Amino acid sequence: MKRCYITTPIYYASGKPHIGHAFTTILADVIKRFKIQNGYEAFLLVGSDEHGNKIESKAKSLNLDPKTFVDINAQAFKLMWKTLNISFDHFIRTTDEIHKQQVQKTFQDLYDKKLIYQSEWKGAYCVECEQNYFTFNKQTMLCEIGHNLSLVQEPCWFISFSSTKNWIETTIGKNQLNIIPKSRASELKNNFINNGLNDLALTRKNVTWGIKVPFDPNQTIYVWFDALFSYITNLGFRNGDPNFIKWWNNDNKEREVIHLISREITRFHCIYWPIFLHLLDIKLPTQFLSHGWIVDGEGRKMSKSLNNVISPEQLIDQFGVDGTRYCLLKEMRLDKDNRCSVSILKEIYNADLANSFGNHVSRTFGMIKKYLNGKLEYQIITDNALQKIMILIDESIVQFDHYFNSYEFYRAINLLLKIVFELSKLIDDFKPWELFKNQEFSLLKQLLFTCVRCVQVCYVLLTPILVNTASKVFHLFNFADDACRKDQLRDATLLKKIIISNSMEVLFKRVD
């Protein structure tokens, strides 16, 4: 069986989940559900990164010990993912004992291989990003995102990259990491690799909240090293767990390991992480999906200091869970930073969900109930105009998958919106009320069957996004189980007999 292992970043547990976390995690969940629809066995890993200076200082400011602080925030992430209908298979925490033991074993292994040496780190450090900087603006003392930098000089353990510089340059240059969008690979080469890849400091001396170096308890393992390995400590890679072979370290040509990340952490995932795996003789992920930032209406990165942060709760309150999932996925592009505001998402919600997908279901349901007493059997379409729509529907099934596999979600969705729009015009042209009045039942049934076929295809294809709504729609029309399956979607004859429910509620109420 084809298998796909999907990860979100292990989010830093210094606060509650925000819209950026929600978008990445919804994206991961939709990809997982899409893979399962297409015959894969899939696994989704989420979690929280719980060590480091930032955590320790924030906990102290609240008069909490670090573990209590991260317990509270990890629980907030878990609850949010359950609210957003995220079908995660495991929530890993870097404070889990099984994770800590494997990280220490890995650090010891690198030391035993003489890949780690002791020296002195001198440069700038960003507490917010948990990131070292060799080069930085000494006048502003701000990191690339805009957080304050502090000067640091301390002894620590480094990992040598001298033997891997050519390897990582070739690996990225030949697109062997399959970084999407491709522009991210160019950014990595131009901004980091071409400037010389410095050895990386793997420990901090003055950080107490973290995993200790096994052979030097005065040093704490760098939070990024700790966090990256959570992707495979979850699978017990150091403990002989068969899940590591099943999901990651195997020779299956159809093996897929997909990391979802935001662009500011691409360097850690697409340079350092592959190097770590290479040095340990572990197979690389098959794809890195690096999306842009979510910015406000003025193009500014969302931050608490600017008071422009949108919480997932705000969106859920306005648009519901499925509406939030849909609007974020439809609006966000992976290859650029995306402007986002409640007003922008409201336009999408009203236009796409309330007026198009939702209204088409209501209209179809109402016509079958009014004109056919709630019953409709399979129809052979002979009318030319309706035949064209049916062809368009069949073609959309293939095209939808093409766009979805390319992560062009807005294009995939627009295919279906076009069908709904064309069919809406045909309904107005055919005037079903007159067909009923004139007892032209053959044409009326063909029209309504085409409408039902459109409902079926749209909601089966959109099931990974509109999870709850799709289930409601299938129940409204009493679709047979086979008619709700993606692998049977080309077969319209599965709509043998439609018997609609007695009543329906509006699927997507307009938001004013």
UniProtKB/Swiss-Prot annotation:
Co-factor binding comment: Binds 1 zinc ion per subunit.
Record-linked CDD domains: MetRS_core
UniProt motif ('HIGH' region) ranges: 11-21
Location, primary (coarse class): cytoplasm
Domain of life: Bacteria
E.C. code: 6.1.1.10
Keywords: Aminoacyl-tRNA synthetase, ATP-binding, Cytoplasm, Ligase, Metal-binding, Nucleotide-binding, Protein biosynthesis, Zinc
Cysteines engaged in disulfide bonds, as pairs: none
Pfam families associated with the record: tRNA-synt_1g (PF09334)
Protein name (Swiss-Prot/TrEMBL): Methionine--tRNA ligase
Taxonomic lineage: Bacteria, Bacillati, Mycoplasmatota, Mycoplasmoidales, Mycoplasmoidaceae
Gene name of this polypeptide: metG
